[in-house]
Amino acid sequence: MTSAPTVSVITISFNDLDGLQRTVKSVRAQRYRGRIEHIVIDGGSGDDVVAYLSGCEPGFAYWQSEPDGGRYDAMNQGIAHASGDLLWFLHSADRFSGPDVVAQAVEALSGKGPVSELWGFGMDRLVGLDRVRGPIPFSLRKFLAGKQVVPHQASFFGSSLVAKIGGYDLDFGIAADQEFILRAALVCEPVTIRCVLCEFDTTGVGSHREPSAVFGDLRRMGDLHRRYPFGGRRISHAYLRGREFYAYNSRFWENVFTRMSK
């Protein structure tokens, strides 16, 4: 029997012991016949987190608690310590939706080539918003047009693919996860799973952004890779600015009507 791929789960954390404990519990509940190595990169949260991480049995494959350069620097540090065939980024307070999620992901990749060269994603549930998201089937054009957001915490990446495309771009800001996903998508099509893989904590900074920031990042992403949803830069930028204007006005009137109804 072929040995099951090793899966590296990378968790970043900062000042969130309760959320970290929930994430660790979720990882340790996985029923997967292969090895799961759990790597925790904490940004120097304090003695309580250090005591928790050092006291966990069995121990982590690797953990540290020290200042870092932000979430994507921490994620890149996690990549550097990972030895698995498949990398999964599950941040503090996020959880796998059930005990068989890792096994489901590996099974979905089975027979499609070397696991370390593939990537894929499923759906996530936005905790507190009663909403499920996951753009299946995946469309590169819709992704570039801002009509699809791939749930990063419900995504998994082969280690060889990550080595090929490089880590997270620290200069790209909060949307570096989507830029990372674009680089993966330009190498190969994702394998998709039409079920919820992750419970996503929506209190993070990336969950609430102004339309100008979201669509500005999409324009910058297209320029960086010279890939546009409608072929040319000019028409694609005009389209994205139009969607930005529509999103801004929709939010404005929603806020007006909300205040009027109080």
From Swiss-Prot:
<keyword id="KW-0808">Transferase</keyword>
<dbReference type="GO" id="GO:0016757">
    <property type="term" value="F:glycosyltransferase activity"/>
</dbReference>
<dbReference type="Pfam" id="PF00535">
    <property type="entry name" value="Glycos_transf_2"/>
</dbReference>
<keyword id="KW-0328">Glycosyltransferase</keyword>
<dbReference type="InterPro" id="IPR029044">
    <property type="entry name" value="Nucleotide-diphossugar_trans"/>
</dbReference>
<dbReference type="InterPro" id="IPR001173">
    <property type="entry name" value="Glyco_trans_2-like"/>
</dbReference>
<comment type="similarity">
    <text>Belongs to the glycosyltransferase 2 family.</text>
</comment>
<protein>
    <recommendedName>
        <fullName>Uncharacterized glycosyltransferase MT1564</fullName>
        <ecNumber>2.4.-.-</ecNumber>
    </recommendedName>
</protein>
